[in-house]
Every structure is written in structure tokens, then in C-alpha cells.
């Protein structure tokens, strides 16, 4: 039976996060590197592709036996969940990760914030000439929250728990890494909370859903 599981939760930003958007039409005096925003609301967003790519990169470091120059060279377990365009071995991704829009705008504004982002001034110094190169980086503020929404297609019950454990491992590793750019300078530390899975298409036994949620609950432990 065609079955899909929805995994929901919250991504909480613990340190200022920068996922870059376009500055092609920035006015004079505007920030050098703006964050990506939803065009309708103007709220900061996390593209699903950014989260999926980061998850896969971390899993590749942990699970691949050697350095993979291309995603198609990832181990079979990763390709099974995230997909592969390898010639002769094409695999459809089992997960769909939706774009995530800032969800706690009212809470942030009630804390006295006039803006949903902050601008951090940074500087690089040329060691040879001592010439400074200042720049302005826009960041999503600490305390921002984004609603996580992932759909997982059940293709093989025999590896269902193994696939969910892979996703949970990616969440765990990301909490000790960073999302977006400039992680080495303290940007982009995040936390996953309120993870919950339910069947939205087809049917699974309650015991199966309970086991999936047990696996996901270990992410925040």
C-alpha cells in the first residue's frame, strides 16, 4: 500500500543564522549579504534544499567508507533515503523537505524586536597591507523558530526503522554542527524540538508509529 509518513517539529535557532539570498538589486548602503526571505511575507526562511543538503553532507562524513566527491558516490543507505542520479542506478529520494518560514514572529516582536533579522558587522584584514575589508552580514536572530515538515515515503517496510534512524542521526549531528554559512564563526547553531511522526497517506500499525517516534525522541536527549 502506498504510504507516507509526515515528520513535524520545530527548528530553533540558538545563534544568529545566515542562509544567503540574492543581493543583486540591493540599494547603496544595504547589507552586503542578506538572508533569504519569503517573497510574500518578507520573513526569513530555511529552504528545504539547504536542510536536506546539510543533512546529507553530515551523513556522508559519518557513513561513507571513503571521501565521496559526488553525492552519487554516497553509500547505498544514504542514496536509498536521499536519492541518486547515478547512471544505471537512479534512485528516487524517499524524503521531501518543505521550505520553512519563520513561525514565531509575534513572540519575537513581543520581546521588543523591531526587526526579525540583525546585521552583524565583520571585518577581514589583509595581512600584507593591513587594509581592512568591512562587510555587513544579515542574520536570523537567536530565538527564531521554523516549522519542520518532512514527508517520508515508505517503500520497503524491512528498512523503515533503519531509514528513520538515518534521518534522526542527521538531526543529531546537525545539532553539533551548523546550518547556513560562517559556522566556524559561531553562526547557525540549531536545535530540533517536538519531533513527531504520523501516517498521512495509507496506514501503519500504531506500534510502528510508536517505534518511529521513539527513535525521533532520542534526537533531543
Regions found by a protein language model. Give the residues of each.
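RNA-binding basic/glycine-rich loop and surface signature characteristic of RAMP-family CRISPR effectors
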Residues: 1-125, 129-221
Amino acid at each position: 500500500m502506498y504510504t507516507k509518513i509526515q515528520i513535524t517539529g520545530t527548528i530553533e535557532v540558538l545563534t544568529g543564522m545566515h542562509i544567503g539570498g540574492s543581493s543583486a538589486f540591493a540599494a547603496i548602503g544595504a547589507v552586503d549579504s542578506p538572508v533569504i526571505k519569503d517573497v510574500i511575507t518578507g520573513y526569513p526562511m530555511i529552504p528545504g534544499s539547504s536542510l536536506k543538503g546539510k543533512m546529507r553532507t553530515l551523513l556522508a562524513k559519518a557513513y561513507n567508507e571513503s571521501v565521496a566527491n559526488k553525492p552519487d558516490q554516497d553509500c547505498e543507505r544514504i542514496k536509498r533515503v536521499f536519492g541518486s542520479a547515478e547512471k544505471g542506478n537512479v534512485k528516487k529520494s524517499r524524503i521531501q523537505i518543505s521550505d520553512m518560514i519563520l513561525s514565531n514572529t509575534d513572540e519575537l516582536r513581543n520581546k521588543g524586536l523591531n526587526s526579525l533579522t540583525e546585521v552583524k558587522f565583520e571585518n577581514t584584514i589583509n595581512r600584507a597591507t593591513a587594509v581592512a575589508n568591512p562587510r555587513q552580514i544579515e542574520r536570523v536572530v537567536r530565538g527564531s523558530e521554523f516549522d519542520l515538515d518532512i514527508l517520508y515515503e515508505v517503500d520497503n517496510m524491512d528498512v523503515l526503522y533503519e531509514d528513520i534512524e538515518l534521518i534522526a542521526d542527521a538531526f543529531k549531528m546537525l545539532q553539533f554542527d551548523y546550518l547556513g554559512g560562517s559556522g566556524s564563526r559561531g553562526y547557525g547553531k540549531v536545535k530540533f524540538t517536538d519531533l513527531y511522526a504520523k501516517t498521512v497517506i495509507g496506514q501503519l500499525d500504531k506500534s510502528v508509529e510508536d517505534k518511529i517516534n521513539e527513535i525521533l525522541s532520542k534526537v533531543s536527549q
